[in-house]
UniProtKB/Swiss-Prot annotation:
Organism lineage: Eukaryota, Fungi, Dikarya, Ascomycota, Saccharomycotina
GO biological process, alphabetically ordered: thiamine biosynthetic process; thiamine diphosphate biosynthetic process
Similarity comment: family membership: Belongs to the NMT1/THI5 family.
Segments carrying motif CCCFC: 195-199
Quaternary structure note: Homodimer.
Name by which UniProt lists this protein: 4-amino-5-hydroxymethyl-2-methylpyrimidine phosphate synthase
Enzyme class, broadest EC rank: transferase
Record bears the keyword Aminoacyl-tRNA synthetase: no
Superkingdom of this protein's organism: Eukaryota
Length: 339
């Protein structure tokens, strides 16, 4: 049986930052483009690139480092746009766990990670801090890093500031503790990368699907851009509409996550060339990409002007850190505006 339905696989169960995809469906933007999109949730986040690459699913979401590694491993996927730009990513832990800002404090600790590349990143970092991978215990957690930290199953784990870090902060508040006791050792700082772009969340698609359906890809991105524009202009209304469609979003915790995600959303959806160069080099350093590897991304299907890249990305990251601290304290919806 054949179908004109296009399948789109999220990188995990519905989360606050998936809002543009759901809004494009809720508000009829896909329908306006004559698209019928089936939004799917994986049972295992590590399956996404394999399912999209094998053609079992047409499109999906995945982080930049995973997208690069997937193509290098023979799964024909390409990034066609950006969803969440450079969310701060690192090793989350709690004050009093024996972990400090010194990476060597991780010796003997149980470190949780989502998928194999998280372990590869930590293993590579040990080389730079006088340690080996045998100096810590790796625990695969999927998306349950914060839960496992709170339960005591692990001492720390890899997460992003606007999701797992928020989960830890809010759990501490419920316990009557200081939310500032939720800490993060940022991987970009530890690895001296100059950006958190390796964890940028991307819209990806199967290469054969792109080649055979270029207009559908353009229309999909046009609908996503329209949804993104609406969300950025009307965050409260957009969040309410998402919550009506996905009642699991209607919690204080998820609202706080959305507020913290808000500044990271890519307004243009463009793949940032400089970020791809950095992560391509980082992938080679991690030995997951060959030396002659060419990054697998395209902006060909974005039909609006490409914005100018940020002049000083490291300064922008410093400003974003201050911005997110303010959001943590005050809440609300505010974008970082660079002069």
């Amino acid at each position: 049986m054949s179908t004109n339905k296009i399948t789109f696989l999220l990188n995990w169960e519905a989360a606050p930052y998936h809002i543009p995809v759901y809004l494009a469906n809720i508000k009829g933007y896909f329908k306006d483009e004559n698209l019928d999109i089936a939004i799917l949730e994986p049972s295992n986040p590590s399956d996404v690139t394999e399912l999209v690459g094998s053609g079992k699913v047409d499109m999906g979401l995945k982080a930049m480092v995973h997208t690069l590694a997937a193509k290098a491993r023979g799964f024909p996927v390409t990034s066609i746009g950006s969803l969440l730009d450079e969310p701060f990513t690192g090793i989350c832990y709690l004050e009093g766990s024996g972990i400090t800002s010194d990476f060597q404090s991780l010796k003997g600790k149980r470190i949780g990670y989502v998928g194999e590349f998280g372990k590869i990143q930590v293993d590579e970092l040990t080389k730079h801090y006088g340690m080996t991978p045998d100096d810590y215990v790796a625990v695969r957690c999927g998306m349950n890093v914060a839960k496992y930290i709170l339960e005591g199953t692990i001492d720390c784990g890899i997460g992003i500031e606007c999701i797992q870090q928020v989960e830890l902060e809010e759990a501490l508040k419920e316990q009557g503790k200081d939310s500032n006791d939720a800490k993060m050792l940022r991987i970009d700082k530890l690895a001296e990368l100059g950006c958190c772009c390796f964890c940028t969340i991307l819209y990806i698609a199967n290469d054969k699907f792109i080649a055979e359906n270029p207009q559908a890809v353009k229309k999909f991105l046009k609908a996503i851009k329209r949804a993104t524009d609406y969300m950025l202009a009307h965050p409260r209304e957009a969040w309410a509409e998402y919550g009506n469609f996905k009642p699991t979003m209607q919690t204080d915790l998820n609202t706080k996550k959305f507020q913290r995600c808000y500044a990271y959303f890519s307004e243009s959806l463009y793949n940032v060339h400089r970020d791809w160069r950095k992560v391509n080099n980082y992938g080679k350093r991690l030995d997951i990409l060959p030396e002659n590897y060419v990054p697998n991304y395209t902006n060909e299907y974005l039909s609006w002007p490409e914005p100018k890249e940020v002049d000083d990305p490291e300064k922008a990251q410093d400003l974003m850190l201050k911005h997110q601290e303010e959001c943590k304290t005050c809440g609300g919806y505010k974008r970082l505006v660079l002069a």
